[in-house]
A protein has these predicted regions:
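Acidic beta-to-alpha connecting loop that harbors the catalytic carboxylate
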Residues: 13, 174-176, 201-203
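Short beta-strand/loop motif that positions the catalytic acidic residue
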Residues: 164, 170-172, 176
Length: 233
């Protein structure tokens, strides 16, 4: 790649730029990165805000909540998104009767952060768990609650995924309890030009848990994309 590719990274719920720090360091010679956050109570509002600040065209990376927001952005302005990298993503609407994370973050933020730190990464990965907690406390419970409300109010978008004709890399950890591998495979199958990759010994946050491997997969994906004619969008 002769020019660095403008690339927007959207962190997961309660995460900040630290989520992607090591991935960006590995990819620094091929991308021009921007980490963008917009913790609002509706995904559509966050999508509009990020589109107003993003480059004219860009690769788009999102994890978990950030992946749902990335999908909202890509559906709103597919002509601006050159490629997608989604991690820990479930395109379904939230299940009825699920936990109310927003209320929990409002009432008992420390308890909710500790709970999430125990499930977003593999239990044995104490360093990743500690990194998540540090990010969560920096982002803060009010922003996290807004993100959680946006997730709770999201629509099921499976029927629209065929509209996303840009190349896409769907990356899922084999031990992800939140967006398990079957969901990632379904997501890749629903998008016309998507590729699914399974990360071994990895949970919900591949960029934090295995940044070198995650970056290598994205680097290879970008190289393959550059070598292929781009589909009409």
């Amino acid at each position: 790649m002769s020019q660095r590719l403008p690339t927007v990274f959207i962190p997961a719920l309660l995460c900040d730029e630290m989520l992607y720090r090591e991935v960006i360091a590995v990819l620094g010679d091929v991308i021009e990165p921007q980490v963008m956050m917009s913790p609002q109570a509706k995904l559509a509002d966050s999508a509009a805000d990020i589109l107003a600040r993003a480059p004219r065209t860009f690769a788009l990376v999102g994890t978990s909540y950030g992946a749902n927001l990335a999908l909202a952005i890509a559906l709103a302005a597919p002509e601006r998104v050159s490629s997608l990298w989604l991690m820990g993503c479930d395109a379904s609407a939230p299940a009825a009767g699920g936990p109310d994370l927003a209320a929990g973050l409002d009432a008992t933020p420390d308890a909710i952060i500790d709970f999430l730190a125990g499930i977003v990464v593999r239990p044995a990965d104490h360093a990743a768990s500690a990194a998540f907690k540090a990010m969560a406390h920096r982002v803060g419970a009010p922003a996290g609650a807004a993100q959680a409300r946006a997730l709770a109010g999201r629509d099921d978008i499976w029927s629209r995924l065929g509209e996303l004709r840009m190349p896409a890399l769907i990356l899922t950890g084999d031990e992800d309890p939140i967006a398990p591998p079957a969901r990632g495979q379904q997501l890749a199958q629903a998008m016309p030009h998507a590729r699914f990759e399974l990360m071994q010994q990895c949970g919900h946050l591949p960029a934090l848990e295995q940044p070198a491997r995650a970056a290598a997969l994205f680097h290879a994906f970008l190289g393959e994309d550059a070598a292929q004619p781009h589909p009409a969008r």
